[in-house]
Amino acid sequence: MSVIECNAEQIKIEKTLNSNIAFVCATNTFHLPGMVGYNNDKIDNWFAEERYQTLYSAFSEKNGGFNFPFAEKLLSGDYGFLCQYDRSTGKDTVWSVIYDMKRHKIYRSEGNPRRHKFKEDIRFQF
């Protein structure tokens, strides 16, 4: 697996950030060497670093065995902030998707996964 981070000036590709982990994660912020300098803390990035840390911690602590119930709980906020914006600020999650590559299944939540259940999406054929 690889992480790809890019902007209008360059593209960086790196295998997993640590060879001992079996996941990649990304949010609206750069983490790869050579890209971090492009982060702009003057714009609203929708809590990108907090969301990244939630993802990284949850996947690190799980250490494999990633499955649909884990992904559903992760996106619903059971492991920390990810999609649970304060709606009074005008922000919310519009949709979330879980891709199960081993079983060739896609699950979609039409809205914030804390309030909307994931349903299998059969429109895409592997």
Feature map (PLM): residue ranges:
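C-terminal, well-structured catalytic/ligand-binding subdomain of enzymes
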Residues: 1-126
